[in-house]
């Protein structure tokens, strides 16, 4: 074998060679299937205790709840903007929540959920909001499946269900999911 040095300009460079944190899945922040932290151009966001979103400013390194209310004590989910109604995981103890958040193309995304008025049916959906925590919206409507693991990558929401891997385009989030893989054994 022969080894040598070369300058970087001689390498072939493709769009797929590097991760763009603004549009690609941020694999480096996934821990055991969850992604409790995500990077943006201004800093980092993470899911803290009880589903509260914390922003860490890149310049000042100051961590603050993502809440717009100046005198908020951040201890009441009904009153504090920093709380997310994160989806409950069906395969864990009651009350365990998905703790994933992802920054992608100028927005923050999280899986959220809520019971209907009868408290029988649990509705899960993909929530999108601006990086300042405002303009929250239910992007997909209620899923008719449970999303076990999920991420956003290059314009698509990908997730695994109990029997398949699907994707939904973010530019048409209420469209029928495209099945990428389906098992016959579940």
Task: Please place each PLM-identified region on the residue numbering.
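Beta-propeller fold detector
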Residues: 63-79, 137-143, 176-184
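Short glycine/acidic-enriched loop and turn motifs that connect beta-strands
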Residues: 50-52, 114-120, 164
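Repeated scaffold domains used in trafficking and secretory/extracellular systems
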Residues: 27-40, 75-103, 143-154, 182-186
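Short loop/turn segments that connect beta-strands within beta-propeller blades
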Residues: 57-61, 130-134, 169-174
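Residue position within the beta-strands of beta-propeller blades
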Residues: 45-47, 109-112, 158-160
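A short loop-to-beta-strand structural motif that recurs across blades of beta-propeller domains
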Residues: 52-54, 65, 125-127, 164-166
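C-terminal motif of bacterial Sec signal peptides marking the signal peptidase cleavage site
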Residues: 2-4
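An edge-strand/N-cap motif at the start of beta-rich repeat modules
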Residues: 7-64
């Amino acid at each position: 074998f022969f080894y040598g040095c070369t300058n970087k300009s001689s390498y072939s460079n493709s769009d797929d060679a590097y991760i763009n944190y603004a549009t690609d899945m941020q694999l480096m922040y996934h821990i055991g299937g969850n992604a409790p932290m995500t990077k943006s151009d201004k800093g980092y966001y993470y899911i803290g205790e009880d589903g509260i979103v914390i922003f860490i400013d890149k310049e000042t390194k100051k961590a603050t709840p993502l809440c717009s209310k100046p005198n908020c004590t951040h201890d009441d989910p009904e009153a504090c903007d920093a709380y997310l109604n994160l989806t409950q995981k069906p395969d864990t103890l009651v009350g365990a929540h998905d703790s994933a958040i992802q920054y992608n193309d100028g927005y923050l995304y999280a899986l959220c959920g809520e019971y209907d008025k009868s408290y029988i049916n649990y509705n899960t959906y993909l929530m999108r909001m601006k990086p300042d925590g405002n303009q929250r919206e239910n992007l997909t409507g209620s899923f008719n499946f449970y999303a076990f693991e999920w991420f956003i990558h290059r314009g698509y929401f990908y997730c695994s269900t109990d029997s398949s891997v699907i994707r939904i385009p973010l530019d048409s989030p209420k469209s029928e999911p495209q099945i990428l893989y389906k098992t016959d054994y579940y």
